[in-house]
């Protein structure tokens, strides 16, 4: 394939755009995330509250949600959040104070999410969105802040949501619904997309199949 053909297909074909642009894009994003982690000040307030909220189960053996709280208020996130951030607390020195390893983990989550989003677009092949727009995936300053400076649970929830979307695009209904359930367990606002998921299941496998798939998930 000549260079002119590649350029033409980059403008018209999502699969070609993902094949040629995704790897350099993710590499550049990892370099940018590294610079941000090393040069920008970490935002402690949300992370500190998260660590306080999971301190009860980890340190005191308290699993009663009514007693779990941080400096920003009571714990409002589902059980998957508690398990995830308890694990991240261990990664952060056991008490949540050594944040740098966690920032690298979140940078990896960011890269994986970019890859999944690009994969979903390649499978969907939207006709009204030009393939070169994959370059705009990394244009948000706020996303970089959320992923490597604030360490929000949204990052993990969206990773699992886009994994679910990718699996559903490939017709892997049970695995897709399982990934979707895990996303909901980390942040419940993922449930806002549940009506769309239900419609897809009804169209693909019918009412009985949708019930069977939901039981597996």
PLM feature spans:
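Multi-pass membrane glycosyltransferase architecture that uses lipid-linked
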Residues: 2-217
